Each structure stands twice: as structure tokens, then as C-alpha cells.
Amino acid sequence: MKLLIAGGGTGGHVFPALAIAQEWLSRGAEREVVLVGTQRGIEMKLVPAAGLPLETIRVAGLKGKGGTRLVKNLAMLGSGLSDAFGVLKRHSPAVAFGVGGYAAGPMLLAAWMKGIPNVIFEPNAEPGLTNKVLARLAKRIATGYEISARAWGEKAAVTGCPVRPEFFTIPAHAAGKPFRLLVTGGSQGALPINRTFVEAAALLAARKSELQIVHQTGERDYNHVRAAYAREEIQAEVLPFLTNMAERFAWADAIVCRAGAITAAEVAAAGRAAVFIPFGRATDSHQLRNAQEMSNAGAGRLISESELTAVRLTREIFFLLDQPREIEAMARKARSLARPGAAREIVNLIEAAARPGGKSGPANGQRDAVGT
């Protein structure tokens, strides 16, 4: 039985896809999987590296586009749908699973039109545009947060976000000196975070003997950030990209990071305190909602991009330095939110959708059966 997993673009889409693929394949030698993305996404590196087959389709985003770019991207929808039908013809999957990202839309629409059952995954507290549309076509919806599940009623199940297993084996936090701070803005880095740390370096230098920093910058800002720490003689390891993220989480006392759903889930799985700086222009402000959920639960602190300054950032870091009990409380609360069975629960939903009688779509006369 073959599972098709559609979506990608960022690690936040691809890592859950890989976790689901691994769980699916672990359930029997007869299981097969194929992943579908685009040629521009990080899946082009991560999926082959995991030893899994990858197909690509032509597609581009629509939200936030205008003028000639919007016209061009609209024209690509037809090409993407044509490519998607080709993928279905080559692989004949029993069920399709969408993890979000540009490829998920046309791929799951094509699957639905062919009567292949769909399951989608919405990791964020605020659902994205693609999943808002695909939810009408899906048999089941797996969500990362209770708040996003409410909109879809009984069709939705709160599973949590699939996280790589090594995050769950990280030992409980044990304080040490100097204070170990991990800074990460995702696979490409985060310009506002990098820029603010550069500006804050002179302020952080006042307590540099108490600090040890690992800062993942992305390629673009690497030299600039490294020079700022060196100028102030702050003990910092600056890297464009981190390949051993679970080990870095285990090392850290606290993490400064974005608030993508998978990042938040990794913070929870690792049981670490965090300062979340959500992407200010993320579609539908989903990162802000994720950060609010974690902050409201006592599992992290929140700085919005509009409030992000060198002074505010330094104040948050010095607060953590001075409040070891707060660090421990946030770490415990974060780990209490972890969902180690997320991949298993999602694959259970996929299997249920794939059982006889589980098909949907126009080929089975059920075009409007969802959400009515």
C-alpha cells in the first residue's frame, strides 16, 4: 500500500513529512511512500538524503502576490495540476497526505478528483490558506493545536506535531555556568533576529563572562554576526546552518527562535525554555498564534517583531540569566506539552482513511460532503 505525501518548501513542512514517511514504512514491508514537492524547496536536499523517492510539480504561491507575478503564478496552477495527475498515474497511491506548502494544493486536489482519500496536517494554531481550502476535501484533519481543531469539528483530531525522535530523548534541563544560549532563525536564518543581536552585542558584553552563545545565522548574515560577537569578545560559535539540532537543543539552557509549528514542537519535546520571536509577516500571523499558545501556557516568552529592539532583547536575556527558577519552570511546562505519539496518531488517521469505503471526491459522488 502506497502513501503519497505532498508539500514542502521549508523544514517546517519537510521534517513532519519525513517523520510520517518513516512511521508509515515501519508498519510493514508492503508499505511504500512517495513525497511530492517543488524544485525550489528544501525537500530537494532533505528527501533524497533520507533515502526516499521525490517527485516535483510546477506550482507557486498566490497569497500576497500582485500584478504580473500573480498572473504568472495563476497560469502555473494548470501546469501544477497536470503534473499532479501525472504523479498519480505513475504511483497509484492508496491515500494522500498533505503537510502544507505550495505542492500540497494541486496534488491533493488532483487526488480528490480521482477519488483518492485525503488527510491533511495543520500544525499551526492559525490555519494556513491552503489548508483552509483543502479541509473541505479531506476525510480527516490532524492538527497541532486544540484551537485550530475547533473550526473543523469531528473531522479534526489533535495529534500534535511530528518531531524527530532524538528530541524526546534529550535529558531534562540541568543549569550550568556560563549560561548557554542557542539562537536560531530557521534553515535560512532570520534577518531581524540576526540584525538585533548585532545591535545588542555591545549591551550583552556587559555580562559576557556569564554567557556562551551558539548562533545559527543562515549564509547571508554569517560574517556580519560573527564580526559583532568578535568585536565585543563574546564567547560565541556562529554557524550558517545546524545539522545536529537536537544536540544543540540538549546543550542549551534557553533558545531564542522563531515560532513555526515544528520549532515550537521541538522546544516542547526537548523541554527547554525559549524566547519566541515570531515572523512578523507570516501568512495569517500563524507564528504569532503559535508563540501566544506557548507563552500563555508558561512554556516560553514572546517578543513580537514590532517590539524587537536591542534593548528589549538584552533585557529578556538578562532576565533569564537572573531567574534560574523561571528557566526551570518554563522547561518543565514546555516538556509537558510534548506529543511523542504524534506521528503514530497521524498515521492511524491515514490508515483509517485508506480503508475500504474511505474514498471521497467526485469519482464517488461526495464533492460537497465535507464541511456542510
What are these regions (language model features)?
Residues 93-95, 250-265, 272-273, 318:
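Acidic donor-binding loop of glycosyltransferase active sites
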